[in-house]
């Protein structure tokens, strides 16, 4: 089961025309099985897995491949992740903004190093609106 407000958040972002992608260290089959099981596949414009890059986060390669596929620059994006040492570090090293998913299993993380810490995924909609001057 997905975390609370995941569908609501992804739907709001997709309706706003926000491009969405997944960067996963999992093999392609495993990543896609999770996405299909959670019925989230229709929200994502790109899914980059270990099979696509041969490198795991925090390597820059999976993040850059995702950005290239989406046609975006790092400063135009926010990466949401639950593992600061891989997700936040990897995204920040190429200039992406970052949000730490505190609503997941944080493994006792106190200081994520992210630009934002999210207690609820729906906070992302508010952050994106603020970043784009909508609110």
Region spans (language model):
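Asp-based, Mg2+/Mn2+-dependent phosphohydrolase catalytic module
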Residues: 7, 11-14, 18-135
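A short, well-structured juxtamembrane/interface segment
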Residues: 1-6
């Amino acid at each position: 089961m997905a975390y609370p407000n995941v569908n609501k958040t992804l739907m709001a972002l997709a309706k706003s025309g926000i491009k969405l992608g997944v960067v996963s260290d999992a093999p392609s089959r495993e990543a896609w099985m999770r996405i299909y099981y959670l019925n989230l596949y229709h929200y994502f414009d790109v899914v980059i897995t270990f099979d696509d890059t041969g490198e795991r986060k925090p390597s820059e390669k999976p993040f850059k491949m995702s950005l290239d596929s989406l046609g975006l620059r790092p400063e135009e994006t926010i990466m949401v992740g639950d593992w600061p040492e891989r997700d936040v570090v990897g995204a920040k090293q190429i200039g992406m903004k970052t949000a730490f998913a505190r609503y997941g299993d944080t493994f006792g993380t106190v200081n994520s190093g992210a630009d934002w810490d999210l207690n609820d995924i729906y906070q992302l909609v508010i952050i994106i609106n603020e970043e784009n001057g909508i609110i």
